[in-house]
Amino acid sequence: MNASTPNPMGTDGFEFVEYTAEDPQLLRTLFGRLGFPVVAQHRSKNVTLHRQGDVNFIINAEKDSFAQAFARQHGPSACAMAFRVKDAAFAYRRALELGAKPGPQSAGPMELNIPCIEGIGGSLIYLVDLYGERSIYDVDFRPEPPSTQAEVAGLTCIDHLTHNVMRGRMDVWAGFYEKLFNFREVRYFDIEGKQTGLLSRAMTSPCGKIRIPINESQDDKSQIEEYLREYHGEGIQHIALATNDIYGTVDVLRSHGVSFQSAPDSYYEGVDARVQGHRESLQALRQRAILIDGNPGKGEGVLLQIFTQNVIGPIFFEIIQRKGNEGFGEGNFRALFESIELDQVRRGVL
């Protein structure tokens, strides 16, 4: 975003994403494979903190919690995310004044009361102003001894995460982020596969660190609609994790048993013509099914990305490396869309 874009909420990036499942061991196993060891345990609740780089994942398995109620409704899911802000109390008051719905306040004795509002699909958006050297985890969590088993995969931060919404609701949620946090649209996509299509508005915070593409289907059979049916509503579709070496990261994750979506063989035949001057090894890309996009000839750099299979209900992860490109892989959307359509055909959805 432009440095002059007003930032009334003082946003400064993602602090964490919170996950839940009726069987939380599924999440613990997955996070182990992704290279996220348990680094802390909540002092009084069945909640664990998993970290790699500047990415914080929380598993909430507390029995009588909002998270577990969310899991009963949606299945394995991402029930909350947290934004870093300059002043959480101010941001919370301002959000309510602008029409946000307050989230549940459930802090116990000697626990931080982190303000939150209702977000996509009834999930929560926490507002956190303690991060970095002084963090929310210092109060509520007890550090765990370093794991000798977890092999990190080089993931550095949350690059972006996406929302899937009902048809006709994309502009509603874009407006939500515009009104409350002064997000701006930085990309608009209209993607048509061979049988299905989607619309997407990529929204970015004034600080430039919180990016949320919002996806809407153009028909009743796309992967967006499949997600909405399986998830029983709108929600977070995928979380994109950044790396400085996507080849090494993918190799480590595959060795841990993480499965990725494939790319059509024909995709790599057109890479040199579509992304001229990219300087990547086609063999290395093809071998790992990594996608590439960008326009280095116009000084826009390249972007490398790959997507896991669905791993938390209908939710999946993206691994992304930016080499001077600030897009979302628009040129890859069609290739990804077609590869997911092929999977839908195999599973009898299409």
Q: Language-model segments: which ranges?
A:
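Extended non-catalytic domains of envelope/secretory-pathway proteins
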Residues: 8-11, 174, 231, 235
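Terminal peptide-recognition signature
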Residues: 81, 177, 239, 314
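C-terminal catalytic subdomain
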Residues: 244-246, 253
